[in-house]
């Protein structure tokens, strides 16, 4: 079926970075009833799960962490579902479609952070924390200041990520389903609030698991059909792609995406350490019963995601062959209908027809819902658990804390809908880049050093953490994306698109310097408490286990 799509889907480098954002204007398309029916089936099924989960959510632990009863395998699938976004699917396959081999290099950037989580973070995080990563950071440091900093870092990351998701959701749904942009944004916001409000982490987990299974199935089918077309020969796949691509053999050469070593290093560090500082990802490690299951979670998640990113590479090259060389998918000017981000969607039509096109469109929508639900729960827990129950009203009952959490979900949902509408025609791709930079420059150094460095003090954590956060924001504003492309200045004050190399360095140096020079009695006491923390982090003695329902 030839769909008359006339959209500009310009992808900045970070737009493929889990942004789900289609930048630029889109023209509303004819209603795609196959996609809508399949999506409605998904919604009805997941709302049924939410109803089931709501009957099992009886306590704070149930709401935040599903009672710690999720298995390692289930959590691995849920983590993959939380992390693999629609733009990982559409954006990276589009990068391969346009740039060839460079798309694979970019996709690997999302994986390199997971060994760090596996070997350095997962086990100790589970043994030291209960509901949020601030539990870990404040284990032996001053509760108030550390939780405020951690919550601010979490909320900024969640807000930026959420806006990008909502705008991307509206654009994507307008493009794929033919629905009005504002209706699409409201629909995503309302469903997101329902999942989190009534089902908590249990419903969110199962939405993410179902979405991961659907996405892996859809991508596997597309890759299988592509490989079947070339006789299951990678040599034939690459040869045919090079034969029809305008760049020819150059699509097999690396180095076209990032222009200089500093940018390459900064991008790599942002992806690697940013992943290890995303609050909605870290929160998932508290849903399992113990450190062993936390390690298994990362093992399974890395396997699922690695497999998925390999599939996007095959899908991208398949799109070069079956979509790029087919005039049916081109507009009058010879450009891909809907822009390059639609390469995977057109490929779905090419290998599976209308029905499979509807399925992939519905999966893209389901993907967005799974990601925003995880983000909303992470933001709500930062407010209710870190700020309300441990800073502003110490000793609050579980019921009071849960009430604040649910009010926060409603507020976050309404804000996300409003901002999604306000940012409709804005370039929001930079927001995800900024979210990763802040996660890498504020959250990650605090988590890592609080678990591993015995000389860390509250003073060092506060000053270094705020320095990292502020540096990331300022350098991003002064860089080419915001300063030149959005604000319209001639030349960027900070020449690199990615601030992570500099902001991470500032954070670690700041934390080290201000901790090392802290000679206060409070600092000495905090250093002495490290031994007890170390024993707990290694043994899990005293950790809250999962409960049977």
Swiss-Prot record:
GO terms for cellular component: plasma membrane. The keyword Transport applies. Keywords: Cell inner membrane, Cell membrane, Ion transport, Membrane, Sodium, Sodium transport, Symport, Transmembrane, Transmembrane helix, Transport. Pfam families: SSF. InterPro entries: Cation/Ac_symporter_ActP, Na/Glc_symporter_sf, Na/solute_symporter, Na/solute_symporter_CS, Sodium:Solute_Symporter. GO terms for molecular function: acetate transmembrane transporter activity; glycolate transmembrane transporter activity; symporter activity. One of its GO terms (biological process) is plasma membrane acetate transport. It is found in: Cell inner membrane. The keyword Cell inner membrane applies. This is Cation/acetate symporter ActP. The lineage of its organism: Bacteria, Pseudomonadati, Pseudomonadota, Gammaproteobacteria, Enterobacterales.
């Amino acid at each position: 079926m030839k769909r008359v799509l006339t959209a500009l889907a310009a992808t900045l480098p970070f737009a493929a970075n889990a942004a789900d954002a289609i930048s630029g204007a889109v023209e509303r398309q004819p209603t795609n009833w196959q996609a809508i029916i399949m999506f409605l089936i998904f919604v009805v099924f997941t709302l049924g799960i939410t109803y089931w989960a709501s009957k099992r959510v009886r306590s704070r632990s149930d709401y935040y962490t599903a009672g710690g009863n999720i298995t390692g395998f289930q959590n691995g699938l849920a983590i993959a579902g939380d992390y693999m976004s629609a733009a990982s699917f559409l954006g990276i396959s589009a990068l391969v479609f346009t740039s060839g081999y460079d798309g694979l290099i970019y996709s690997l950037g999302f994986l390199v952070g997971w060994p760090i989580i596996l070997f350095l973070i997962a086990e100790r995080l589970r043994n030291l924390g209960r509901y949020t990563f601030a539990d870990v950071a404040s284990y032996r440091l001053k509760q108030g200041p550390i939780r405020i900093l951690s919550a601010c870092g979490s909320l900024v990351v969640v807000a930026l990520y959420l806006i990008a998701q909502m705008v991307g959701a509206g654009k994507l749904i307008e493009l794929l389903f033919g629905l009005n942009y504002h209706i699409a944004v409201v629909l995503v916001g309302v469903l997101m609030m329902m999942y989190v409000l009534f089902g908590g982490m249990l419903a969110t987990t199962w939405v993410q698991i179902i979405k991961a299974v659907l996405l892996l199935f859809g991508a596997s089918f597309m890759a299988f059909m592509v490989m079947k077309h070339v006789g299951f020969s990678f040599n034939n796949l690459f040869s045919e792609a090079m034969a029809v691509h305008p760049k020819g053999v150059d699509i097999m050469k690396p180095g076209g995406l990032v222009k200089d070593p500093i940018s390459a290093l900064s991008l790599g560090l942002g992806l690697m350490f940013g992943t290890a500082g995303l609050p909605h990802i870290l929160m998932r490690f508290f849903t399992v019963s113990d450190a062993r299951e936390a390690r298994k979670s990362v093992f399974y998640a890395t396997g699922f995601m690695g497999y998925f990113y390999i599939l996007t590479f095959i899908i991208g090259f398949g799109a070069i062959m079956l979509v790029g060389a087919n005039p049916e998918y081109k507009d009058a000017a010879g450009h891909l209908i809907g822009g390059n981000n639609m390469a995977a969607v057109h490929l779905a039509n090419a290998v599976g027809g209308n029905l499979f096109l509807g399925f992939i469109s519905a999966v893209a929508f389901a993907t967005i819902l799974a990601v925003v639900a995880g983000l909303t729960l992470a933001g709500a827990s930062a407010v209710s658990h870190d700020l309300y129950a441990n800073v502003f009203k110490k000793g609050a009952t579980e019921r009071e804390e849960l009430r604040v959490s649910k009010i926060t979900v409603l507020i976050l949902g309404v804000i996300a809908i409003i901002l999604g509408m306000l940012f409709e025609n804005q370039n929001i791709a930079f927001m995800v880049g900024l979210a990763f930079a802040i996660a890498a420059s504020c959250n990650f150094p605090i988590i890592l050093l609080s678990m591993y460095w015995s000389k860390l003090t509250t003073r060092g954590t506060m000053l270094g953490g705020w320095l990292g956060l502020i540096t990331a924001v300022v350098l991003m504003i002064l860089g080419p994306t915001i300063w030149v492309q959005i604000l319209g200045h001639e030349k960027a004050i900070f020449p690199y698109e990615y601030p992570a190399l500099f902001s991470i360095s500032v954070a670690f140096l700041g934390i080290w310097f201000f901790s090392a020079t802290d000679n206060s009695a409070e600092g000495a006491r905090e250093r002495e408490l490290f031994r007890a923390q170390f024993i707990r982090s290694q043994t899990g003695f005293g950790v809250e286990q999962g409960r049977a329902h």
